[in-house]
Amino acid sequence: MLNNSTRNLLARTLASVTLAATSMTLHAAPQAMMRSNPRVSEIRLEVNLYSVAATTVGGLSTGRVAAFRMQNVEVAMPVMLRSTWCDTDFDKVAVRSWIDGGEIKLDAAQVFKRNADSAEGVFAFNMHTERNGFAELRVQATYLVQRWDVTVDEGAAAAVTWPRTWPAGTSRFLAKEPGIDPTNTDIMQCAESASPGGSRAVTPFYAAKNAVIAILTRWKAMVGGSGDRNADRSLRGISFSSGAFGLSVGRGSQLELAAACVAAVRSVQIPARIVYGLSVDGKNGASSVINFRFICEFYLPTIGWVPFDPLEMRSQGAASRAGRGSIKGFANVSDLSDVLPLGLQITPVGYEKADRFAIWGWRGVSAANVDSENATTRIRLETSSRGNGKTKSMPVPMIDPVP
C-alpha cells in the first residue's frame, strides 16, 4: 500500500484540481459536460511474461523452458490519476509480483511513479532473480476506480470559440508523435477542407467534428479487431495492419483509424489525443474477455477534454452524415464508463514495447536474451463492483491534475 505521505500528496492534488476545475466549469459553462451515475470498481491489472514450451528429459516434462534469459527486468503498467470519466483512488493500492511461482515482496509506494506535469503514472516493477533466467514472471496491481457516464451539451460545446492560446499542458497534444502525424499533407488537406471556408470559419467543435467525419468518409475498410491474442485467447497486444494502411489507402485497424482522426484534429490546431484503455466483455471475473479500446478526445476551453469514438461514429454512418446534426460517438460516447483508461501513449515514457505494443512496457531487456520461439506475454484485467459512488453528478474537471 502507498505510505501516508504519498497518499496524502495525491489526495491533496486531486482535491485541489477537482475544486478548481469545478469552480471554473461552473463559472464558464455550468452544464456543458457532466459526469453522472458513478460506479466504483476494484481493478486488478496484471502483466504476465511466460514460456509456452516445456523442458523434457527422457520424454518427461520437467517444467517450462526458461525463455527469458536475464536476471533483471523492469516492467511498467500504466495508470491514469484522472480522465474525463474516471478517477483513481490511491487510498488502497496493493502490488504483488512473482518469478517462477516465488513471490517477490515490493513496496507499493516505491512501485508507483507519477509522471511530472501529467495525469499519467506507472506501476514500475523492478524484478530480479539470482538465476540466469526464468520461465514465468507476473506483476499485479490492485486499486479502486470510480467511473461515470459523461453527457455533453453539444450546443454549449459548439458555441465555444477559438482561444488566443491553448492552456499549458496541451501543447504535446498538438505535436507529431509516433503513429500520429498532423503534418502529413494528405491528412492536413483532408481536415482543413472538411469545413466550408476552412477550419477557422467554424468553431473548434465543428472543426474537429468535420475533420473526423472527413477521415471516416475516406476510411472504407476496417482490418482486424482491437487486439492480438495468444492460443489461449488471452490478450497479447494491439492489432495493426499487416499490409498498407492509412488515409491514402482507406483502410486500417481500430488504432490506426483513431490515430488518423487525432492527427486530423491536431492538424487544424486543436489539441487531441488517444486514451488507451481496456474494457471487459461480460460479468466480473477472470473468465471475462478483455479488449483494447481507443477513446479519442479533443480539448475545448472552458469545457475540457471532449471524447469521441471513431469506431462508434463509423457504425452510425457518420461518413454519410456530414453537417451539423448530432452523431452518436462524437462528444456523447456509448459505454464510456465501461472503459478503464490507462495511458495517453502506446508505451509508458522511458520504456519499450515487449513482443507487442500492449500499453505496458519493459526496459533492461535485450532481444538476444529472449527466446522468441517460446516466449510470449499477456495482459489481464479483472473488475469487481464495489457499489455506486456518493456524488451522483458533477461537472467534468476541465484540466488534467498537475502539481
Residue ranges of predicted features:
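Bacterial N-terminal signal peptides
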Residues: R12-T25
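A mature extracytoplasmic/lumenal domain signature
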Residues: V79, Y143-V145, A158, Y276-L278, ...
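Intrinsically disordered, low-complexity N-terminal segments that are enriched in acidic
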Residues: A29-V150
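N-terminal secretory signal peptides that target proteins for export/translocation
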Residues: M1-L9
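Secondary-structure boundary elements
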Residues: L137, R147-S253, A368-N388, M398-V402
